[in-house]
UniProtKB/Swiss-Prot annotation:
Subcellular location: Cell membrane
GO molecular function: molybdate ion transmembrane transporter activity
Organism: Bacillus subtilis (strain 168)
Principal location: membrane
Sequence ranges assigned to domain ABC transmembrane type-1 in this UniProt record: 17-221
Gene: yvgM
SUPFAM superfamilies registered for this protein in UniProt: MetI-like
UniProt name for this protein: Putative molybdenum transport system permease protein YvgM
Length: 227
């Protein structure tokens, strides 16, 4: 490929790139759905323990990624109930698999989507939603046709930020999913291995790739904010 140095094959370069996008896409879909629903609920809910629950939602944002990875290993490990149940159902453990990379990326990206969604839904005038329900609309219809469109700017921002975070996840993925080429080796882990092995040319190629992608994502958000 003309854009790549002659010492780098297209397959060698694109394998972790494609894998990263696949992992980020699936993790992003999960995070967008769960983050939107959790944000909508928490923006209006009032119950004992709400602050504690919200703190748990936001913890992955401040915890070191290695700690997140360790917690995931404990939760999904062979000695845990969840880990044993998954291994019994699917005949293999989840640790060091493609799905482990998805789970790790989703966990660290969730707080960004949740916080954006909560802010967007909290800014909606409750009277607008109440008027629609008085006219006979169900809660689900009000949510889909009124709440989501009104919160769309915040939801879009949260979606892009969470996708970017999932794409750039390193520590939790390395601990929980490992660094298996073609299976769990995403761009961040591939860059680390390339640099550690002295392959600076390949590392630079991947660094430029992820910087450009991240720049375009953030640029898109800024463009939307100014229009």
């Amino acid at each position: 490929m003309a854009l790549l140095p002659s010492s780098i094959s297209a397959s060698e370069f694109f394998t972790p790139v494609v894998l990263s996008f696949q992992v980020a896409a699936v993790a992003g879909i999960v995070v967008i759905i769960l983050g939107t629903l959790a944000g909508a609920w928490m923006s209006r809910a009032s119950f004992f323990g709400k602050t504690a629950l919200e703190t748990c939602f936001m913890l992955p944002l401040v915890l070191p990624p290695t700690v997140v990875g360790f917690i995931l290993i404990v939760i999904f490990g062979k000695h845990s109930f969840i880990g044993q149940a998954i291994e019994w159902i699917f005949q293999q453990p989840v640790i060091f698999t493609w799905w482990a990379a998805v789970i790790a990326s989703a966990v660290v990206a969730f707080p960004l989507m949740y916080q954006s969604a909560k802010t967007g839904f909290a800014d909606i005038d409750p009277d607008i939603q109440g008027a629609a329900m008085v006219d006979g609309a169900s809660r689900w219809k009000v949510f889909i046709h009124i709440s989501v469109p009104l919160a769309y700017p915040s939801l879009l921002t949260g979606s892009i930020l969470s996708l970017a975070r999932a794409l750039g996840e390193f520590g939790a993925t390395l601990m929980f999913a490992g660094n298996i080429p073609g299976v769990t080796q995403t761009l961040p882990t591939a860059i680390y291995v390339a640099l550690d092995s002295g392959n600076n040319t390949l590392a630079w190629a991947w660094v430029v790739c992820i910087v450009v992608i991240s720049f375009l994502m953030l640029f898109f958000i800024q463009q939307k904010k100014t229009h």
